[in-house]
Structure formats: C-alpha cells, structure tokens
Design a protein with these regions (language model features):
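Conserved ATP-utilizing enzyme core subdomain
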Residues: 19-21, 192-197, 365, 369-419
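Acidic, glycine/GT-rich loop-and beta-edge segments that sit at the periphery of enzyme/chaperone cores
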Residues: 157, 335, 343-345, 350-372, ...
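Active-site phosphate-binding/coordination module
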Residues: 58, 78-158
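ATP-dependent carbohydrate kinase catalytic cores
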Residues: 158, 212-328, 338-339, 351, ...
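Glycine-rich phosphate-binding/hydrolytic loop that grips phosphoryl groups
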Residues: 133, 275, 279-283, 341, ...
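Gly/Ser/Thr-rich active-site cleft segment
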Residues: 13-15, 137, 142-274, 358, ...
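Activation-segment/catalytic-loop signature of the eukaryotic protein kinase fold
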Residues: 390-489
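N-terminal glycine/serine-rich phosphate-binding loop of ATP-dependent small-molecule kinases
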Residues: 1-108, 235-238, 260, 264-269, ...
Length: 586
C-alpha cells in the first residue's frame, strides 16, 4: 500500500494558460489546482494573425509556473507542501525557442526583450510554410527517408521549419542563437537549475515527433542532410542532442533557487517533459488501439500499440510514430486537427463582430452596459447555437463545410489549406452554419480514423478528453454518429495535468511504471455516447460529400500554391460538377 502522504505536482502549459494541480499519488485525487492566463499573450503581443505569427514570451511561462504552484501549495497547506515528491510538466508542441549556450531563451536577454523571433514559436504559428515545403522537397533527394516516422510529410508547425525561418528572417537572432529548445524540455531544465544547454535532457516525445530523432539512424539526420538544405543549418545538430529520455525518467532534482521560490523541499524530483496531448492520453487512461482525443482549440489524437505488433508498419500522413513517446515500451502514434474548438470560436467571433465594433460606439448605451452585453452574449452564443442546431432535422441539412480553417494537420499535413462552407441559400441561418462546422470537425476526425485503419492500425474505440468533450453533448453525440463507434468521456477536467502528475509519481519511484500510475491515479469515465443507428447511414453519405468538397478545395487552391493562376472556365465547370454530386446524395 502506498503511503497517502505522498503528493505530486502536474503542470500543463496550454495555448492560453498554464494549469497546475497537486494530486495524491495514492489515488490521483486533486488536492489543489490553479490556472494562470498569460498576460502578454492575452493582449496578443508579439503576434500577427494576418501572417499566422503566434509567439509567446518566456516570462508568461515562468511567471505562470511560479504563481500556479504557489497558489496550489497555499490551498493544499504546509503538510502537503512538505511531502511533494515530484513535478512533471507538459506543454504545447512544437513550441521551440532560440537559446544561448546557457540554455536561456534570447527574449530574456538584453536587446531581445521585444523581439518575437527570440520568443517561443507557438505550435500554431504558420510563418514557416515555405520552409516546410522546402524540407519536404529536400527529403525526396536522399536514399534514406528521414520523414518516414513523422508520416512522410514535415509540417510548418514543427521544429526544423521554425528554426530555419527564424534563422533566415532575423540577423540579430542568427548572431546570438546557440541552440533551439522545445518548451517541454526547457521547463524541467529551468526547474533543475540548468546552465549548460548541452546537459539538457531532451524528451523522446518532442524529439521523435517533431525533430526527426530516431534510433534507426542513430539520432538526428546527419549534418549533411541539413547543410545541403540550407547552409544556415550547417553544424546545428552538434548543438542539439544525441540521447533522448522517456517521461517516466527524472530530469534531475529541483534547484535550491526554485525550491526556495516555491517553498518546496530540495529533494523534489523533476520529471522529463513531454507534449500536452501525450501526457493527456496517459491522464485519460489510454488503452492499446483506442484513439485518445484531446479536444480543445485543436485536437491531438493519440494511439498506442505494442511495439512487436506494429513492427514494420508506417502510417503515412500522420504526425509521427515514436517508441516511448506516450507509454514507454509502446509505439505512440500522433495525429490531429489544426482547428477544432478554434473553428467554433472563429464563427463566434464573426457573430459578435457587430457587438464589438458597432454597439461599442452607441450613444444610447453606456460603455459599461456594452461590455456586459458583449460578455453575456459571447458566453451564450455557442450553447444556444448548439441547442438550436441539435433540433434541426437531418432531412433539412443542406449546408456542407470543410474544417481546414487553420490548415490541415492530419491526414497529410498542409497548412495552406483553407476552410469552406457551401450549400447556403437565403434560408441559411447561424444555427445551420454552426451545425455544418461541427459536422465538418467530426468528419475531419473520421478522416484520421480512416487513415489509421487503411494503413493496418485498428481503432477499437474512442476516448474523449478536454474542454469540448466535457462541455458539449451535442458535438460528442455527432462524433459518435459520424464515427459509428462509442466515445467515452474521461471524468477528469484536467487530464493533461493529471497525466503529468502520473509521470511525476513514476519519475519519483512511487510507481515502477506509468501503467501502474494510471491504474492507481486514474479517475475513470463519467459519460459515454453511442451512435444513433438512424443517423449512421446519413453521415456515411455526408462524409463522402465532405471528401469531395475537400478534394475540390485542394485542387483549386493548387495545393496552397497561391502564385499559380486558376483557369476560370475549368473552375466553373468543376464547381458545377461538385454541386451536382453533392445534391445527388441528398
């Protein structure tokens, strides 16, 4: 029996905030929790949505780390604080930053404080689309396919594309950068008091899925592969890493400085970091061949399989398959959608535009009342749209959408792809458009399952986690109907932070392996959605229409090549054929 006076801390860095929990290592019960919204990010400093630039200042992360842990320890009390055994961290990814030789992000150094290129390049930053395209073209020139374990396509959301973009665009950063570091590797390094980036323990999770590390070729691709891509990368691999570590291992122990700042014992173990969805899958009690879907602003879909059962199988077009990236000893496979909750948030933003831009100038209503009206309306829009969309008869459905509002992550990454809604007429209203967007996100999820199955990886069921999964029965029921399989919703509202806590307990030696931590600390499931047999065939036909529309978009945006001119006559002819094909299925 594990002593009940052992506690661990799980820290979950999301896109907008950092969430920290203190959990009982015996049963996973949440003792305390705290959320910190990044103040600079909230003001959208250093970001430019028009060019898909999204950067985050390291101070948002550092301040959030200290604030949330201190708040948790205040809630939990001195007795709990004295018995904290370990801390583990998950973050978004790929979210890398330029650092100096000591491992300090350049944005923390004089002269770089307000330079976006010296900050963390958030996962959804798509400024490096051209660099990603160059990497993909370059990879085809070599006998060894160094992209084979990342689905065969390198994304603009990932490490090397972002590094190359920063090096090309910023002479100041280029002259001061020593290495490039993922967020999930930097926080443990910070907590352990690291001052030499060469000693930083890099997690296999980010290394395998985003940085092209693989044991099959002895680590990273050879220097000549990168040097021939661009001379700016010549020699860079020597300043990165050769070894990687799974997240059940310790990165070290907390430094005296951080122990003092946080009020923790100097014996606290710091675990090796990983990306949020991977630790979230563990927090959500993932099982072999069950697709674990972390559904928030985007989705990250995780699947684990015993290494001996999938040996030799490479799944094309996903975000990678890496031994030990989720559960040590199993192949962790990652896929996902670039916009899920963000697609709904975009439509909400469109609908609230008049309130934000016209009502605020009203001479009839005070600014305080306007602010209250905007906040109240914004809070109610998605729930009300969901309620009315749910009441729509499927016989009346005409609108059809594609969910690539932030590009396409999986299958077959292409961040230049765009969303679309067709089939609208003068009877189309907001609930109908919203329903089409929700349906499209569910179809995008189905495309991922279809890809796994086509490539010989069975999907036995679905596990739902995250804000959308817990807050929207309408979306989850449609997901079950579209997928034609049940989806279980995990009870924990903080599966990523809980997963981090499970890894912390394992790194501290409280458990021998993370599966034991899952069994002891897992909170179970509190909802399950089953497909409605009356709607399954309807959605099967609609899904074929979705694929036709997606194919049309891909063909007629020239695969995202905006410098090519479309032939109007051919476009009109193909558009007419698309509409006829869609209408014929009604």
């Amino acid at each position: 029996m594990i002593a009940s006076n052992e506690y661990v801390i799980g820290v979950d860095y999301g896109s907008d905030s950092v969430r920290t929990i203190v959990a009982d290592a015996h049963n996973g019960n949440e003792i305390a929790s705290s959320v910190y919204y990044y103040p600079r990010w909230k003001e959208q400093l250093y970001c430019n949505a028009a060019i898909n630039q999204f950067r985050q200042h390291p101070l948002d992360y550092v301040e959030g780390l200290e604030e949330t842990i201190k708040q948790c320890l205040t809630q939990a009390g001195a007795a709990v604080a004295a018995n904290i055994k370990a801390i583990s961290v998950d973050t978004t990814g790929s979210t890398p930053v330029a650092v100096d030789k000591t491992g300090s992000p350049l944005a923390l150094l004089p002269g770089f404080e307000n330079n976006p290129n010296a900050m963390f390049v958030l996962w959804k930053d798509h400024t490096s689309v051209e660099e990603a395209a160059e990497i993909n073209a370059h990879a085809g020139k070599f006998d060894t396919n160094y992209l084979q374990f990342v689905g065969g396509i390198y994304s603009s959301e990932w490490f090397w594309a972002k590094l190359l973009h920063v090096l090309r665009k910023d002479e100041q950063v280029r002259g001061s950068i020593y290495s490039f570091v993922e967020h999930c590797d930097w926080i443990p390094f910070l907590l352990t008091g690291g001052n030499d980036v060469a000693q930083m323990k890099r997690g296999v999770c980010a290394a395998g899925h985003k940085i092209l590390w693989a044991k099959e070729w002895g680590g990273l691709p050879p220097n000549e592969w990168f040097a021939s891509l661009d001379p700016l990368l010549d020699g860079f691999t020597s300043r990165l890493f050769k070894e990687t570590y799974t997240s059940d291992q310790a990165a070290g122990t907390i430094s005296k400085e951080w122990a003092s700042r946080l009020g923790l014992p100097e014996t606290v173990v710091i675990g090796v970091g990983a990306m949020d969805a991977h630790m979230g899958a563990v927090g959500g009690q993932i099982e072999p061949y069950y697709l674990s879907k972390v559904m928030g602003t985007s989705t990250c879909d995780m699947l684990v399989a015993p290494a001996d059962e999938v040996e030799g199988k490479l799944v094309a077009g996903i975000c990678g398959q890496v031994n030990g990236s989720i559960i040590p000893g199993m192949i962790g496979m990652e896929a996902g959608q670039s916009a899920f909750g963000d697609a709904y948030a975009w439509f909400k933003k469109v609908l609230t535009w008049p309130l934000q831009n016209i009502l605020s100038k009203s001479s009839i209503v005070s600014l305080d009342v306007v602010k209250q009206l905007v906040e109240e309306t914004a809070d109610k829009i998605i729930p009300e749209l969901s309620r009315q969309a749910e009441q729509l008869s499927i016989e009346d459905v005409g609108e059809l959408a594609v969910d690539w509002f932030n590009g396409r992550r999986t299958p077959d990454a292409n961040q230049l792809m765009t969303g679309a809604v067709i089939g609208m007429d003068l009877g189309t209203d907001a609930p109908k458009i919203f329903r089409a967007i929700v349906e499209a996100t569910c179809f995008g999820a189905k495309a991922i399952v279809e890809r796994f199955v086509e490539q010989g990886i069975p999907v036995k069921g679905l596990i739902g986690m995250g804000g959308v999964a817990r807050k929207s029965p309408f979306i989850m029921q449609m997901m079950a109907d579209v997928m034609n399989m049940p989806i279980r919703i995990h009870k924990s509202e903080q599966t990523c932070a809980l997963g981090a806590a499970m890894f912390a307990a394992t790194a501290a030696g409280i458990f021998n392996k993370v599966e034991d931590a899952m069994n002891a600390m897992g909170q179970g499931f509190d909802a399950e959605y089953h497909p409605n047999p009356e709607k399954v065939s309807f959605y099967r036909k609609r899904y074929e229409q979705y694929k036709q529309l997606g194919k049309f978009i891909e063909q007629h945006t020239n695969g995202g090549k905006k410098d090519e001119v479309l032939e109007p006559e051919q476009l009109a002819m193909d558009s007419e054929q698309l509409v006829m094909a869609v209408n014929s299925e009604k």
